[in-house]
Amino acid sequence: MHDSPARRKTRPGRWRWAKRLVAAVVLGLVCACAWVLVAHERVRLDGEHELTEARAEVTDADPDWTWEKLNAARKKPPAGLNGADLVPEIKAATEPEWGQAFARDEFASRLDPLPNVQFAPDVLAQARRDLKGSADAVRLARQLKHRPTGHREIELAPNVVGTLLVDTQNTRLVADLLRWDVTLAIEDGDIRRASDSLLALLNASRSIGDEPLFVSQLVRMAVRSVAVRYTELALAQSPSVPLIELQAALAADAEEPLLLYGTRGERAALDRLFDNLQTGVVPLEEVLGPRPKNLWGWQDHAHLPMDRATALRRMTACVEAARRPLHEQAPALAAIPEPPADPHLVISGATLSTVENVAQAFWRTSAQARCAVVGIACERFRQQHRRWPGALTALVPAFLPAVPLDPYTGEPLQFAKLESGAVVYSVGSDRRGDGGTLDSVSNTAPRFRLWNPDQRRRPAPPAPAPEREPPP
Protein backbone atom coordinates (compact mmCIF):
# COMPACT_ATOMS: atom_id res chain seq x y z
CA MET A 1 0.00 0.00 0.00
CA HIS A 2 1.45 3.39 -0.95
CA ASP A 3 1.09 6.79 0.73
CA SER A 4 -0.90 9.23 -1.21
CA PRO A 5 0.89 12.32 -2.58
CA ALA A 6 -1.06 14.46 -0.05
CA ARG A 7 0.23 12.42 2.94
CA ARG A 8 3.83 12.53 1.67
CA LYS A 9 3.50 16.28 1.35
CA THR A 10 2.24 16.93 4.95
CA ARG A 11 4.73 14.68 6.86
CA PRO A 12 7.72 17.11 6.65
CA GLY A 13 5.47 19.89 7.97
CA ARG A 14 4.57 17.84 11.03
CA TRP A 15 8.24 17.23 11.82
CA ARG A 16 8.98 20.91 11.51
CA TRP A 17 6.29 21.73 14.10
CA ALA A 18 7.58 19.01 16.43
CA LYS A 19 11.10 20.39 16.20
CA ARG A 20 9.84 23.89 16.86
CA LEU A 21 7.92 22.68 19.92
CA VAL A 22 10.95 20.86 21.31
CA ALA A 23 13.12 23.89 20.66
CA ALA A 24 10.61 26.11 22.42
CA VAL A 25 10.52 23.79 25.44
CA VAL A 26 14.31 23.62 25.59
CA LEU A 27 14.56 27.38 25.24
CA GLY A 28 11.99 27.82 28.00
CA LEU A 29 13.94 25.52 30.30
CA VAL A 30 17.15 27.36 29.54
CA CYS A 31 15.46 30.68 30.23
CA ALA A 32 13.95 29.34 33.46
CA CYS A 33 17.33 28.05 34.63
CA ALA A 34 18.93 31.34 33.70
CA TRP A 35 16.23 33.21 35.59
CA VAL A 36 16.77 31.01 38.67
CA LEU A 37 20.52 31.53 38.49
CA VAL A 38 20.12 35.27 38.06
CA ALA A 39 17.59 35.43 40.91
CA HIS A 40 19.89 33.31 43.09
CA GLU A 41 22.80 35.61 42.36
CA ARG A 42 20.66 38.71 42.88
CA VAL A 43 19.55 37.44 46.30
CA ARG A 44 23.15 36.68 47.22
CA LEU A 45 24.45 40.04 46.00
CA ASP A 46 21.67 41.97 47.77
CA GLY A 47 22.51 40.07 50.94
CA GLU A 48 26.21 40.77 50.56
CA HIS A 49 25.46 44.47 50.15
CA GLU A 50 23.32 44.50 53.31
CA LEU A 51 25.98 42.54 55.17
CA THR A 52 28.71 45.00 54.20
CA GLU A 53 26.58 47.87 55.48
CA ALA A 54 25.66 46.02 58.68
CA ARG A 55 29.29 45.21 59.46
CA ALA A 56 30.26 48.84 58.90
CA GLU A 57 27.48 49.99 61.24
CA VAL A 58 28.49 47.69 64.07
CA THR A 59 32.18 48.49 63.63
CA ASP A 60 31.41 52.20 64.01
CA ALA A 61 29.44 51.51 67.19
CA ASP A 62 31.71 48.83 68.68
CA PRO A 63 35.15 48.55 67.03
CA ASP A 64 36.12 45.43 69.03
CA TRP A 65 32.99 43.48 68.21
CA THR A 66 34.48 40.51 66.35
CA TRP A 67 35.31 37.35 68.26
CA GLU A 68 39.06 37.84 67.93
CA LYS A 69 39.08 41.51 68.94
CA LEU A 70 36.52 41.07 71.71
CA ASN A 71 38.57 38.32 73.36
CA ALA A 72 41.84 40.19 72.91
CA ALA A 73 40.33 43.15 74.79
CA ARG A 74 39.09 41.12 77.77
CA LYS A 75 40.80 41.97 81.06
CA LYS A 76 43.00 39.33 82.63
CA PRO A 77 43.55 39.10 86.42
CA PRO A 78 47.05 39.52 87.83
CA ALA A 79 49.11 36.35 88.14
CA GLY A 80 47.99 34.19 91.05
CA LEU A 81 44.59 35.89 91.38
CA ASN A 82 42.67 34.16 88.60
CA GLY A 83 39.82 32.22 90.19
CA ALA A 84 39.20 30.30 86.98
CA ASP A 85 42.58 28.58 87.38
CA LEU A 86 41.40 26.90 90.58
CA VAL A 87 38.25 25.34 89.15
CA PRO A 88 39.89 22.39 87.31
CA GLU A 89 42.10 21.73 90.35
CA ILE A 90 39.04 21.64 92.61
CA LYS A 91 37.24 19.32 90.22
CA ALA A 92 40.22 16.95 90.11
CA ALA A 93 40.39 16.84 93.92
CA THR A 94 36.67 16.10 94.35
CA GLU A 95 35.57 12.52 94.93
CA PRO A 96 33.81 11.09 91.84
CA GLU A 97 30.88 10.08 94.07
CA TRP A 98 30.28 13.66 95.23
CA GLY A 99 26.57 14.49 95.36
CA GLN A 100 25.31 10.98 94.62
CA ALA A 101 24.00 10.40 98.14
CA PHE A 102 21.90 13.57 98.11
CA ALA A 103 20.33 12.44 94.84
CA ARG A 104 18.57 9.62 96.70
CA ASP A 105 14.83 9.89 97.31
CA GLU A 106 15.24 9.98 101.10
CA PHE A 107 16.79 13.46 100.84
CA ALA A 108 14.68 14.83 97.97
CA SER A 109 12.34 17.05 100.00
CA ARG A 110 14.76 18.06 102.76
CA LEU A 111 17.59 19.90 101.03
CA ASP A 112 15.93 23.31 100.80
CA PRO A 113 14.33 24.26 104.13
CA LEU A 114 13.53 27.84 105.03
CA PRO A 115 16.78 29.67 105.77
CA ASN A 116 16.00 29.98 109.50
CA VAL A 117 15.32 26.24 109.84
CA GLN A 118 18.16 23.82 110.52
CA PHE A 119 18.94 20.93 108.24
CA ALA A 120 17.95 17.53 109.58
CA PRO A 121 20.69 15.62 111.48
CA ASP A 122 20.96 12.90 108.84
CA VAL A 123 21.36 15.54 106.11
CA LEU A 124 24.18 17.18 108.05
CA ALA A 125 25.80 13.82 108.73
CA GLN A 126 25.79 13.00 105.02
CA ALA A 127 27.24 16.42 104.20
CA ARG A 128 30.07 15.78 106.67
CA ARG A 129 30.86 12.45 105.05
CA ASP A 130 30.87 14.02 101.60
CA LEU A 131 33.08 16.94 102.61
CA LYS A 132 35.49 14.64 104.42
CA GLY A 133 35.93 12.60 101.24
CA SER A 134 36.69 15.78 99.26
CA ALA A 135 38.60 17.67 101.95
CA ASP A 136 41.40 18.71 99.59
CA ALA A 137 38.87 20.10 97.12
CA VAL A 138 37.20 22.13 99.88
CA ARG A 139 40.52 23.58 101.01
CA LEU A 140 41.25 24.64 97.44
CA ALA A 141 37.76 26.10 97.04
CA ARG A 142 38.20 28.26 100.14
CA GLN A 143 41.15 29.93 98.44
CA LEU A 144 38.69 31.60 96.09
CA LYS A 145 38.11 34.11 98.87
CA HIS A 146 41.30 35.80 97.69
CA ARG A 147 40.45 35.62 93.97
CA PRO A 148 37.56 37.99 93.21
CA THR A 149 37.70 37.65 89.44
CA GLY A 150 38.59 35.20 86.72
CA HIS A 151 39.43 34.68 83.07
CA ARG A 152 39.62 31.69 80.78
CA GLU A 153 40.10 31.49 77.05
CA ILE A 154 37.13 30.10 75.11
CA GLU A 155 37.81 28.17 71.92
CA LEU A 156 34.74 28.21 69.70
CA ALA A 157 33.79 25.01 67.91
CA PRO A 158 33.15 25.44 64.15
CA ASN A 159 29.47 24.99 64.98
CA VAL A 160 29.49 27.35 67.95
CA VAL A 161 26.49 25.62 69.53
CA GLY A 162 28.78 22.67 70.21
CA THR A 163 31.40 24.72 72.08
CA LEU A 164 32.41 22.85 75.25
CA LEU A 165 32.56 24.80 78.52
CA VAL A 166 33.64 22.05 80.88
CA ASP A 167 35.50 24.19 83.42
CA THR A 168 32.77 26.83 83.37
CA GLN A 169 30.12 24.21 84.13
CA ASN A 170 32.30 22.77 86.91
CA THR A 171 31.87 26.08 88.73
CA ARG A 172 28.53 24.62 89.86
CA LEU A 173 30.42 21.81 91.60
CA VAL A 174 32.63 24.35 93.38
CA ALA A 175 29.50 26.15 94.58
CA ASP A 176 28.07 22.89 95.88
CA LEU A 177 31.21 22.18 97.91
CA LEU A 178 31.23 25.67 99.39
CA ARG A 179 27.55 25.85 100.28
CA TRP A 180 27.88 22.74 102.42
CA ASP A 181 31.09 24.11 103.91
CA VAL A 182 29.17 27.24 104.92
CA THR A 183 26.40 25.12 106.43
CA LEU A 184 28.73 22.94 108.49
CA ALA A 185 30.84 25.90 109.58
CA ILE A 186 27.70 27.47 111.06
CA GLU A 187 26.79 24.16 112.72
CA ASP A 188 30.28 24.02 114.23
CA GLY A 189 30.16 27.63 115.41
CA ASP A 190 33.09 28.52 113.16
CA ILE A 191 31.81 31.92 112.10
CA ARG A 192 35.04 33.05 110.47
CA ARG A 193 35.12 29.97 108.25
CA ALA A 194 31.47 30.50 107.36
CA SER A 195 32.17 34.09 106.36
CA ASP A 196 35.26 33.15 104.35
CA SER A 197 33.44 30.37 102.51
CA LEU A 198 30.53 32.69 101.72
CA LEU A 199 32.93 35.11 100.07
CA ALA A 200 34.64 32.20 98.29
CA LEU A 201 31.21 31.06 97.08
CA LEU A 202 30.47 34.47 95.61
CA ASN A 203 33.93 34.53 94.04
CA ALA A 204 33.27 31.15 92.44
CA SER A 205 30.60 32.95 90.45
CA ARG A 206 32.97 35.83 89.72
CA SER A 207 35.64 33.41 88.47
CA ILE A 208 33.63 33.19 85.24
CA GLY A 209 34.33 36.87 84.70
CA ASP A 210 33.27 38.31 81.37
CA GLU A 211 33.18 35.02 79.43
CA PRO A 212 31.43 36.05 76.22
CA LEU A 213 28.75 33.37 75.93
CA PHE A 214 25.24 33.13 77.31
CA VAL A 215 25.85 29.71 78.85
CA SER A 216 28.81 31.08 80.80
CA GLN A 217 26.86 34.03 82.14
CA LEU A 218 23.87 31.85 83.03
CA VAL A 219 26.20 29.67 85.11
CA ARG A 220 27.58 32.81 86.75
CA MET A 221 24.06 33.99 87.58
CA ALA A 222 23.11 30.58 88.98
CA VAL A 223 26.15 30.36 91.24
CA ARG A 224 25.63 33.94 92.44
CA SER A 225 22.06 32.97 93.36
CA VAL A 226 23.47 30.15 95.49
CA ALA A 227 25.75 32.67 97.21
CA VAL A 228 22.78 34.95 97.95
CA ARG A 229 20.71 32.03 99.22
CA TYR A 230 23.44 30.92 101.64
CA THR A 231 24.08 34.47 102.79
CA GLU A 232 20.39 34.56 103.72
CA LEU A 233 20.82 31.22 105.50
CA ALA A 234 23.94 32.38 107.37
CA LEU A 235 22.15 35.43 108.77
CA ALA A 236 19.14 33.31 109.69
CA GLN A 237 21.28 30.75 111.53
CA SER A 238 24.04 32.81 113.17
CA PRO A 239 23.90 36.24 114.82
CA SER A 240 27.52 37.20 114.30
CA VAL A 241 28.69 36.49 110.73
CA PRO A 242 31.13 39.24 109.63
CA LEU A 243 29.30 41.23 106.98
CA ILE A 244 31.12 44.33 105.76
CA GLU A 245 33.47 42.61 103.30
CA LEU A 246 30.70 40.38 101.97
CA GLN A 247 28.34 43.33 101.50
CA ALA A 248 30.95 45.27 99.54
CA ALA A 249 31.68 42.29 97.29
CA LEU A 250 27.99 41.65 96.62
CA ALA A 251 27.36 45.34 95.95
CA ALA A 252 30.09 45.37 93.32
CA ASP A 253 28.94 42.13 91.74
CA ALA A 254 25.29 43.19 91.62
CA GLU A 255 26.24 45.92 89.14
CA GLU A 256 28.25 43.70 86.78
CA PRO A 257 26.76 43.90 83.24
CA LEU A 258 26.46 40.15 82.76
CA LEU A 259 23.83 40.51 80.04
CA LEU A 260 26.14 42.80 78.08
CA TYR A 261 29.04 40.35 78.39
CA GLY A 262 26.91 37.54 77.04
CA THR A 263 25.16 39.51 74.29
CA ARG A 264 28.35 40.97 72.83
CA GLY A 265 29.95 37.55 72.80
CA GLU A 266 26.95 35.82 71.28
CA ARG A 267 26.82 38.42 68.50
CA ALA A 268 30.46 37.69 67.66
CA ALA A 269 30.01 33.92 67.95
CA LEU A 270 26.90 33.97 65.77
CA ASP A 271 28.73 35.94 63.10
CA ARG A 272 31.54 33.37 63.22
CA LEU A 273 28.95 30.62 62.72
CA PHE A 274 27.51 32.40 59.67
CA ASP A 275 31.00 32.69 58.24
CA ASN A 276 31.52 28.95 58.70
CA LEU A 277 28.17 28.23 57.05
CA GLN A 278 28.94 30.43 54.05
CA THR A 279 32.38 28.91 53.53
CA GLY A 280 31.13 25.34 53.95
CA VAL A 281 33.11 24.63 57.13
CA VAL A 282 29.79 23.80 58.81
CA PRO A 283 27.06 22.15 56.70
CA LEU A 284 23.78 24.04 56.75
CA GLU A 285 22.00 20.82 57.73
CA GLU A 286 24.00 20.72 60.97
CA VAL A 287 22.36 23.94 62.12
CA LEU A 288 18.95 23.92 60.44
CA GLY A 289 18.33 20.19 60.21
CA PRO A 290 17.68 18.24 56.98
CA ARG A 291 17.15 20.55 54.03
CA PRO A 292 15.08 19.70 50.93
CA LYS A 293 17.14 18.28 48.06
CA ASN A 294 15.58 20.64 45.58
CA LEU A 295 15.63 24.22 44.40
CA TRP A 296 14.27 25.49 47.72
CA GLY A 297 17.10 23.91 49.68
CA TRP A 298 19.68 25.18 47.20
CA GLN A 299 18.37 28.71 47.61
CA ASP A 300 19.07 28.60 51.38
CA HIS A 301 22.74 29.29 50.75
CA ALA A 302 21.97 32.39 48.68
CA HIS A 303 19.97 33.79 51.60
CA LEU A 304 22.74 33.34 54.17
CA PRO A 305 24.28 36.82 53.68
CA MET A 306 20.91 38.53 54.25
CA ASP A 307 20.20 36.29 57.24
CA ARG A 308 23.64 37.16 58.60
CA ALA A 309 23.11 40.90 58.11
CA THR A 310 19.70 40.71 59.80
CA ALA A 311 21.11 38.74 62.74
CA LEU A 312 23.99 41.18 63.12
CA ARG A 313 21.69 44.19 63.21
CA ARG A 314 19.26 42.54 65.64
CA MET A 315 22.03 41.42 67.97
CA THR A 316 23.55 44.90 67.83
CA ALA A 317 20.20 46.33 68.90
CA CYS A 318 20.22 43.83 71.77
CA VAL A 319 23.75 44.90 72.74
CA GLU A 320 22.64 48.53 72.83
CA ALA A 321 19.68 47.55 75.02
CA ALA A 322 22.03 45.68 77.37
CA ARG A 323 24.13 48.84 77.79
CA ARG A 324 21.18 50.68 79.34
CA PRO A 325 20.37 50.80 83.07
CA LEU A 326 18.66 47.59 84.13
CA HIS A 327 15.16 49.05 84.42
CA GLU A 328 15.39 50.42 80.84
CA GLN A 329 16.49 47.17 79.25
CA ALA A 330 13.11 45.42 78.98
CA PRO A 331 11.43 48.31 77.10
CA ALA A 332 14.49 48.62 74.84
CA LEU A 333 14.36 44.92 73.93
CA ALA A 334 10.60 45.10 73.39
CA ALA A 335 11.09 47.98 70.94
CA ILE A 336 13.32 45.95 68.60
CA PRO A 337 11.21 45.29 65.47
CA GLU A 338 10.48 41.79 64.29
CA PRO A 339 12.53 40.60 61.31
CA PRO A 340 10.91 40.44 57.85
CA ALA A 341 8.50 37.54 57.40
CA ASP A 342 10.90 35.61 55.20
CA PRO A 343 11.10 31.83 55.69
CA HIS A 344 14.73 31.92 54.58
CA LEU A 345 15.78 34.15 57.51
CA VAL A 346 15.72 31.21 59.89
CA ILE A 347 18.66 31.92 62.18
CA SER A 348 18.15 35.66 62.66
CA GLY A 349 14.49 35.10 63.49
CA ALA A 350 15.37 33.22 66.69
CA THR A 351 17.92 35.68 68.10
CA LEU A 352 15.66 37.99 70.09
CA SER A 353 13.81 35.25 71.98
CA THR A 354 17.14 33.82 73.14
CA VAL A 355 18.33 37.20 74.39
CA GLU A 356 15.03 37.84 76.18
CA ASN A 357 15.23 34.52 78.04
CA VAL A 358 18.74 35.28 79.28
CA ALA A 359 17.71 38.84 80.13
CA GLN A 360 14.92 37.56 82.37
CA ALA A 361 17.45 35.52 84.35
CA PHE A 362 19.78 38.51 84.53
CA TRP A 363 17.14 40.90 85.87
CA ARG A 364 15.93 38.36 88.42
CA THR A 365 19.38 37.51 89.77
CA SER A 366 20.47 41.16 89.76
CA ALA A 367 17.40 41.97 91.84
CA GLN A 368 18.29 39.12 94.21
CA ALA A 369 21.83 40.44 94.63
CA ARG A 370 20.67 44.01 95.23
CA CYS A 371 18.15 42.78 97.79
CA ALA A 372 20.95 40.86 99.52
CA VAL A 373 23.12 43.98 99.71
CA VAL A 374 20.29 45.89 101.37
CA GLY A 375 19.45 42.92 103.59
CA ILE A 376 23.00 42.78 104.91
CA ALA A 377 22.82 46.52 105.59
CA CYS A 378 19.57 45.97 107.51
CA GLU A 379 21.21 43.28 109.63
CA ARG A 380 24.16 45.55 110.38
CA PHE A 381 21.68 48.27 111.39
CA ARG A 382 19.89 45.79 113.68
CA GLN A 383 23.13 44.67 115.30
CA GLN A 384 23.98 48.29 116.12
CA HIS A 385 20.52 49.59 117.09
CA ARG A 386 18.81 46.37 118.29
CA ARG A 387 15.88 46.98 115.94
CA TRP A 388 15.07 46.94 112.25
CA PRO A 389 15.20 50.24 110.35
CA GLY A 390 11.91 52.04 109.93
CA ALA A 391 12.64 52.56 106.24
CA LEU A 392 15.50 51.80 103.89
CA THR A 393 16.46 55.48 103.79
CA ALA A 394 17.57 55.08 107.42
CA LEU A 395 20.45 52.94 106.14
CA VAL A 396 21.97 55.82 104.17
CA PRO A 397 24.81 56.73 104.43
CA ALA A 398 26.10 54.71 107.39
CA PHE A 399 25.23 51.28 105.98
CA LEU A 400 24.52 52.01 102.31
CA PRO A 401 25.67 54.79 99.97
CA ALA A 402 22.16 54.79 98.46
CA VAL A 403 19.16 52.47 98.28
CA PRO A 404 19.59 50.32 95.14
CA LEU A 405 16.94 50.49 92.45
CA ASP A 406 14.59 47.69 91.53
CA PRO A 407 15.69 46.38 88.10
CA TYR A 408 12.05 46.05 87.09
CA THR A 409 10.85 49.57 87.90
CA GLY A 410 13.78 51.90 88.43
CA GLU A 411 12.31 52.75 91.84
CA PRO A 412 14.04 51.92 95.15
CA LEU A 413 13.70 48.36 96.39
CA GLN A 414 10.86 47.78 98.83
CA PHE A 415 11.00 46.89 102.51
CA ALA A 416 8.54 45.43 104.99
CA LYS A 417 8.77 44.80 108.72
CA LEU A 418 6.88 41.71 109.79
CA GLU A 419 6.03 40.08 113.09
CA SER A 420 8.89 37.60 112.81
CA GLY A 421 11.44 39.72 110.95
CA ALA A 422 11.83 41.88 107.86
CA VAL A 423 12.16 41.47 104.11
CA VAL A 424 13.74 43.47 101.28
CA TYR A 425 12.10 42.73 97.96
CA SER A 426 11.61 43.57 94.30
CA VAL A 427 8.25 43.76 92.55
CA GLY A 428 9.44 40.96 90.26
CA SER A 429 8.79 40.33 86.60
CA ASP A 430 5.01 40.21 87.11
CA ARG A 431 5.10 43.61 88.91
CA ARG A 432 2.79 42.21 91.61
CA GLY A 433 5.05 43.26 94.47
CA ASP A 434 4.03 40.33 96.67
CA GLY A 435 7.55 39.38 97.75
CA GLY A 436 7.18 40.87 101.21
CA THR A 437 6.71 37.60 103.10
CA LEU A 438 9.09 35.37 105.02
CA ASP A 439 7.70 31.86 105.13
CA SER A 440 6.46 31.17 101.61
CA VAL A 441 8.88 28.90 99.77
CA SER A 442 6.77 29.14 96.60
CA ASN A 443 7.09 32.91 96.23
CA THR A 444 9.46 33.54 93.34
CA ALA A 445 9.77 37.34 93.61
CA PRO A 446 13.39 38.38 94.25
CA ARG A 447 13.78 39.09 97.95
CA PHE A 448 16.09 38.79 100.94
CA ARG A 449 14.54 37.65 104.20
CA LEU A 450 15.69 38.49 107.72
CA TRP A 451 14.41 36.93 110.93
CA ASN A 452 14.24 38.34 114.43
CA PRO A 453 16.90 36.77 116.68
CA ASP A 454 14.32 34.64 118.51
CA GLN A 455 13.11 33.22 115.19
CA ARG A 456 16.53 32.11 113.97
CA ARG A 457 17.93 28.61 113.88
CA ARG A 458 14.62 26.85 114.29
CA PRO A 459 14.82 23.08 114.77
CA ALA A 460 14.49 20.81 111.80
CA PRO A 461 11.09 19.18 111.31
CA PRO A 462 10.87 15.49 112.17
CA ALA A 463 12.16 13.13 109.52
CA PRO A 464 9.36 11.61 107.43
CA ALA A 465 8.32 8.17 108.57
CA PRO A 466 9.55 5.39 106.29
CA GLU A 467 6.94 4.02 103.96
CA ARG A 468 5.54 0.71 105.10
CA GLU A 469 5.60 -2.28 102.87
CA PRO A 470 2.11 -3.20 101.70
CA PRO A 471 0.79 -6.36 103.34
CA PRO A 472 1.25 -9.52 101.28
PLM regions and their residue ranges:
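Short acidic linear motifs
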Residues: 2-472
